[in-house]
């Protein structure tokens, strides 16, 4: 860190808005940004890398992943080939998030001592539309649970999460199912389709994610692994048909992502996870454990959601960043967004 007197340590809140697609996250984030617009240089909004997804070295990940399901249903591609194509397109979503996350992490002051307090204004806010955990865990796991991907594709996505710096505040956004279906139908992104089983599973998986983070604060995944049954077709169908996963104040391992990660393909003869995948599970656990989870309803207006998000700020975990690093981050974000406009 620079010793220049103008390069001072600041309190920063790193906030990631996440959740199922089409529920109004981006609109809520923009409204939150508008709320703080009266304070120049106070908040930095990092949008979804949509244009990169639309043209990642010449491939459109969004049209590709949804189009593959249409081709499979029409009989234009075999189920096995469709699973391979889906895994390919899902991997394309990961790269922009992972690269940006690595740049952000490198700019953070990761020391846990002498945290600058953020309970007194002004402090900086970095608001990101999604965390890499969306493209590496929540969406691929949901694709697997509806049969769009094979289990062989999961470890390369689930267990390769980047290290998580201190001060990650993950805000999972929710709406009622009727509102969700209405909103995602109206936004009509090119190539995007509405598949009810996938939407339902994704909603369940995000609740499992919150339960997982809470569970790992006081437990480890080893403790209850042997009590879990294998994730079978009956459980998968249940996840596709109802909102069967409930948010728990004190979740058990059966309420977490580990309930769907206990797959025969990842385990040995007696249900023990194979060593390589066990190490990967530790990576996933360490990343999740480092987060502070929150839930934000988007059921009402974007203005109401922005106000509700503001009320959560005092509960969030701060991080440190130098003023110089903050300026570098702004330049990086502006450069990326300028090239995707």
Curated annotation (Swiss-Prot):
**Keyword DNA-binding: yes or no?**
no
Anything else known: Phosphorylates and thereby activates certain drugs like acyclovir (ACV), valacyclovir, and famciclovir to a toxic form, that leads to successful suppression of the infection, while the uninfected cell does not have this ability because it lacks TK. Mutations in thymidine kinase may induce HSV resistance to antiviral therapies in immunocompromised patients. The most frequently observed resistant strains are unable to express TK and are avirulent in animal models of disease.
Residues the record lists as binding substrate: 66, 90, 189
Q: Which family does it belong to?
A: Belongs to the herpesviridae thymidine kinase family.
Active-site residue list: 48
Which protein, by its recorded name, is this?
A: Thymidine kinase
Q: What does this protein do?
A: Catalyzes the transfer of the gamma-phospho group of ATP to thymidine to generate dTMP in the salvage pathway of pyrimidine synthesis. The dTMP serves as a substrate for DNA polymerase during viral DNA replication. Allows the virus to be reactivated and to grow in non-proliferative cells lacking a high concentration of phosphorylated nucleic acid precursors.
Superkingdom of this entry's organism? Answer: Viruses
User: Which catalysed reactions does the entry list for this protein?
Assistant: thymidine + ATP = dTMP + ADP + H(+)
> What HAMAP family does the entry give?
HSV_KITH (MF_04029)
EC code:
2.7.1.21
Q: Which Pfam families match?
A: Herpes_TK (PF00693)
**Effect the entry attributes to changing residue 154 to P:** In strain: Isolate 40a2
Oligomeric state and interaction partners are given as: Homodimer.
Q: Where is the signal peptide?
A: none
Q: Where does ATP bind?
A: 19-26, 183
Q: Name one GO molecular function term.
A: ATP binding
Keyword list (alphabetical) reads: ATP-binding, DNA synthesis, Early protein, Kinase, Nucleotide-binding, Transferase
Which BP terms from GO are recorded? Answer: DNA biosynthetic process; TMP biosynthetic process
